[in-house]
């Protein structure tokens, strides 16, 4: 079962995201619904693209996800004035389940490092990951097949 979830602020037609706490609460509610009505005891692999990847990472313990898939994780926020951007690496380091990050080689939001349970695959392109969608799909498929999670 695959569920495509659109963030509430996008559904409402807004360009700016809601505060992290509200995004996380909405995500947890969706996962609770899926666990009750859709997953039928199957493992949960949470994931998202860009901001959605951050939400999946921040909520991994609350949702009980067995693994996390991050497409275009925004490691560094856009620079603002003279203030250096603050890395979001702690959000990745807090994840204790297997994780795949698929990142564009020229992603302006940075390149996350590999970690103990964190595999990083770089593909041609930028933050949009549209240049080589076949490579993105292949990386995800290979990772899913190799996951040590019972089906």
Where are these regions (language model features)?
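Conserved hydrolase catalytic core segment
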Residues: 58-67
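Active-site nucleophile loop of the alpha/beta-hydrolase fold
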Residues: 7-8, 69-78, 106, 125
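Serine-hydrolase catalytic machinery in alpha/beta-hydrolase-like enzymes
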Residues: 1-43, 88, 122
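Catalytic histidine-centered segment of alpha/beta-hydrolase-like enzymes
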Residues: 125-138
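Gly/Ala-rich beta-loop-alpha elbow adjacent to hydrolase catalytic centers
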Residues: 48-56
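Short beta-strand/loop motif that positions the catalytic acidic residue
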Residues: 95, 101-103
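Conserved alpha/beta-hydrolase "acid-adjacent" motif
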Residues: 104, 108-113
């Amino acid at each position: 079962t695959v569920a495509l979830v659109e963030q509430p602020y996008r559904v409402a037609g807004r360009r700016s995201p809601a505060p992290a706490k509200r995004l996380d609460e909405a995500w947890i509610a969706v996962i609770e619904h899926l666990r009750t009505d859709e997953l039928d005891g199957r493992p949960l692999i949470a994931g998202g693209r860009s901001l959605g990847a951050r939400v999946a990472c921040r909520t991994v313990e609350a949702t009980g996800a067995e693994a996390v898939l991050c497409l275009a994780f925004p490691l560094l926020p856009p620079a603002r004035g003279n203030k250096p951007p603050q890395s979001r690496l702690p959000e990745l380091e807090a994840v204790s389940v297997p994780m795949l990050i698929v990142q564009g080689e020229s992603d302006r939001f940075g390149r996350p490092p590999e970690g103990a349970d964190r595999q990083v695959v770089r593909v041609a392109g930028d933050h949009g990951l549209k240049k080589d969608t076949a490579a993105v799909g292949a990386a995800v498929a290979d990772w899913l097949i190799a996951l040590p999670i019972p089906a």
